Amino acid sequence: MLWHYKISPHLSVITDSEPTMTNAVTAETANTNHTNNASSDKTQYQPQLIEAQQQAKWATDKRFEVSNEPSDKPSRYMLSMFPYPSGKLHMGHVRNYTISDVLSRYYRLKGYEVMQPMGWDGFGLPAENAAIANQTPPAKWTFENIDSMRAQLKLLGLSIDWSREFATCSPEYYQWEQWLFLQLYKKGLVYKKLATVNWDPVDNTVLANEQVIDGKGWRSGAMVEKRDIPMYYFNITDYADELLDDLDQLEGHWPSEVITMQRNWIGRSSGMEVHFPYELAGQSNSLDVFTTRPDTLMGVTYVAVAAEHPLAQYASENNKAIADFCALCKKGSVAEADLAKAEKIGMDTGLTVTHPLTGEEVPVWVANYVLMSYGSGAVMAVPAHDERDYEFATKYNLPIKQVIDIPAGYFDDVEEGNENCAYTERNTLVNSGEFDGMDFEQAFEAMLAKLEPQELAKKKIQYRLRDWGVSRQRYWGCPIPMVNCEHCGTVPVEEQDLPVVLPTDVVPDGRGNPLKNIPEFVNTTCPKCGNPAERETDTFDTFVESSWYYARFASPHDTTNMVNKSAANKWLPVDQYIGGVEHAVMHLLYARFFHKLMRDENLVSGDEPFANLMTQGMVLAGTFYRVNADGSTTYYFTKDIDIDFNERGQPIKAILKSDGQPVTIGKIEKMSKSKNNGVDPQITIDKYGADTVRLYTLFTAPADQTLEWSDDALKGPYNFVKKVWRIASEHIQALTDANLSLESLNSDALNTDSLSKEAKALRRKTHETIGKIDSDLGKRLALNTPVSSLMELANELSNFKASSEQELQVQHEALTDLLIMLSVYAPHIGEYLLEQLGLDTVTLNYPMVDESALVQDMITMVIQVNGKMRGKMDVAPNSDPEQLKAQARAIEGVAKFLTGEIKKEIVVPNKLVNIVVAG
C-alpha cells in the first residue's frame, strides 16, 4: 500500500468577540501578565482578540494571494529559507520570517505586487529518526508537523500566499527533480562512480565532509569509516568557472562574508600538473600530481599517495604491514578539517618514481593525509617549503632540501621547540641547478618549457570544489529514477513513468535502508530490454530539494513543467532572500548551480537565483545550570528560575523555584534544546501578542546581528503598542466630542497656513519619520531603527494636545501615518486601528513626505563660550551670521561669561555659535 499524503486544509483563526475603541482606557491600566485573559472590558488592548480577528479577515479575503498574470504593478519576490517541519517553531524561525514579512508589507505599501510564499523542506534524516523512536511512518510524522507549524506561522500574522504552499516530500514536487536528473544524465552532467566516502555505521549512510565533526557523525556521534560505494554525482565542476565568476554580480548585494566563503570553497588555483614516471610489473606509467608551487619541484624528497592509490594497493599485496596500514587509513573521516587536525602518519611502500627534472629515484610513501577523492590521490612533498610535509619528514627522518632562498633572520622569532620551520613564501630559487636565481614566474615558465615537450608536465587549473555526490543510503528521500539491469547495466527510468513514488507506509527500524526490503518498490522491469530489474534504492541528498524550491514557488501547481517560464520571468530572481550564514557553501552554492542548470534547460532566465541576500543573526539566550556531584551539568528552563536583574537589565541572581536554591548564571548562547534556553514562541505570543513579539525580534538588534533574548525586555515593545492603542482611543474620543466625521478628516486637505508651533512640530516629526523609515527599509535594509522612529513619533503624538479642529486634523494625519508605518511591523493592531479610523487597509499606500512640512520657521541654536554651552536661542533658519553673533552676545546668560577679550566667533549654520574669549 502506498500512502499519498497531501497538505491538509489550512487553519483559520476566528473570534466571536470584536474589540472596540470606544472609551478606551490608558495603556498603563492593562496588566502585562494577563493579556491572554479574555477581559470583559473591551476597551483594553486585547491582542489575542484583535489578532485572531485580523488573521481571519486576511484568510477570508485571500489578501496576500498574487497572480502570475501580467500586472501594472512592479513585482517583488520576498523569500525566507523554508523550514524543516520539526513540529515546533523556535525564535530563530520567528525572527527570520518576521524580517521577510516586514519587507513584504513595506513593498506592498510602496505599490509592488509582492509574492511571499511558504513551503516545507520535507525529506530528511530527522524524520527517519523520529519514526524509529515513535514507531510511526516518517510521512505521517512529517505532515502532522507541517499542520502544526503552519498554524503557528499563521499566529505571527505573516502575509504569506498560502495558495503556493507545497512540501518537497510530495510526489507532485519531487517528480520534477527526477525529471531534471534524467535530462542531466542525457547530457553527461550526471554520472555514477565508485567513491571513497564518509560512512556512518550507525545511521548507515554517507556523510558530507561538513557532517563529520572530529571524526564522528554529526548526528549519531559514531566514529566515521571510509568506504568505497557506487554513487551518483552532479558534475558541478563543469560550472565551477561560472559559479566563481558570477560572484562578481553579487558584490554589494550579498554579504561579503558569504561571497568570500564561496570563492574559497570553489578554490580555483592555477598551477602545473607534473608527471613522475615509474615502471611497475613491466609496465610504464606515471604518478601525476598537481602543484601550485612548481618552483619548489627541485626540493621534492618523497611523494605521498592515498591508501586507495594503485601504487599503495600494489605495495600491500605482498606486505601485510602495508595492507594493515592502508586498512587503518580507511578508518576515519575524509573531511579536510579533520585530516588537518589528525596526526600525520605514513609508511614507506618500498616503491619509487623518477624525478622528472633530475632523474633521481623518489621514494613513495602511503600517508593518511592524502585522499583518493582529491586530485589524483598523490602529492609531491617538499618538506623545506611546506609545513605539513616538514612535519611528516621530521617524524620519519626523510631528507629536507631547501630550494627557495630564505631571508636572513627569517626564523629568529620562532619559539624554541617549534619543530615546524618550513619556509613557505615565494623567493629566489637556490640549489636548483639551471633554475638558480629565478623568481617564481621565471621558474614556472622555464620548467614548463623543459618538461612539456617531454610530456612530463602541463599547465593546469584545478578547483577545490568537487563534484556533488547526491546518493544517500536512507529511506526518507526522493527516489533516484534509475534501474539496475543485469543485462543493460544502469538504465534511466522513462520520463512517462515519473514520478518514481516513495512508499509512505514504511516504519524504518534503523538497520539500513528499508527500501531494499520492499519487493513492490525494488522489483521492476528494465526500460531498455524488458527483463526483470531492480530499482535504485538510494535517495537524493536533501540539498537537491532545497536547491530549486524557490523557482517552483513561481508555478507550484504546474503539472506540465518543472517551472513555468512565463511565471519565472515575472517573479525571478528572488529580490530578497533571507537565511542563516551557515548555508553559505552548501545550500546557497547548490541553489546557484541548480539555477544555471534550469537556465540551460530553458526553464528560467538570468544567471543567479537570489538578487539580494540577508543573513540574519542568531537568537541567543541566557543559560542557568548546576554542576552535579558526578561532574555532569543540568541546565534549567528560564521559566523555572526566579531572576533578579540590575539597573542595566543584566541577571545578577538566579534561584530555582522548585527548591529555592541558587543556580549558576551561565553564558549567553544560541537557543538549543541541550541548554534548555529556548523560548517557546507560542507562550510568548499568548502572553504579549504576536505584534509585540514581532516588534521585539526586530527592534532589539540589527537583523544581521545576534539577538540576545530577554523576557523582561519584551515589556518595552508591549508598552509601546499599548501607548499607540491609548493614543488612538483618545483621538477617536476627541473626534466624537468635536462632532467631526472620519470621512471628512480622511479626505479633506489640511490647511497649514495658520498652524501653531506645536502643530507644525508634530507635522515635521511625522514627515521626517516617513522619510527616514522609507530610507531605512528601502535603501539601507535597516529593520531595527524604524521601530525607534515609530516610538519617537508616538511620544510626540502622546504629548500633543489638540485644542482646535485644525489641530485635530494634524493629529489625525500623524496618527494615520504612524499606523500605516506601524502596520509593517505590527500588522494586527496597525490595520485594526486604521479600520477604526475609517480607512480601507487593502488600498493603502505608504505615506508621501510633504516637503513643506519639513521647512522650519524657527530653529534652536546652541551658544557656546570657549566650547561650553551657555545658552540657546530661537532664530530663523539661515539667519545672517553677524546678526547671530550679536544676538548671542546679548543674551543675559551668555554675556556674563564674556568678561575677557573676544578672540573669535564661530558660526556653524543652523546649529551653534561658539565665542572664544581670552583668559
UniProtKB/Swiss-Prot annotation:
A motif ('KMSKS' region) lies at residues 670-674. InterPro entries: aa-tRNA-synth_I_CS, aa-tRNA-synth_Ia, Leu-tRNA-ligase, Leu_tRNA-synth_edit, M/V/L/I-tRNA-synth_anticd-bd, Methionyl/Leucyl_tRNA_Synth, Rossmann-like_a/b/a_fold, tRNAsynth_Ia_anticodon-bd. ATP binds at K673. It is found in: Cytoplasm. SUPFAM superfamilies: Anticodon-binding domain of a subclass of class I aminoacyl-tRNA synthetases, Nucleotidylyl transferase, ValRS/IleRS/LeuRS editing domain. It is an enzyme of class 6 (ligase). This is Leucine--tRNA ligase. It comes from Psychrobacter cryohalolentis (strain ATCC BAA-1226 / DSM 17306 / VKM B-2378 / K5). The lineage of its organism: Bacteria, Pseudomonadati, Pseudomonadota, Gammaproteobacteria, Moraxellales.
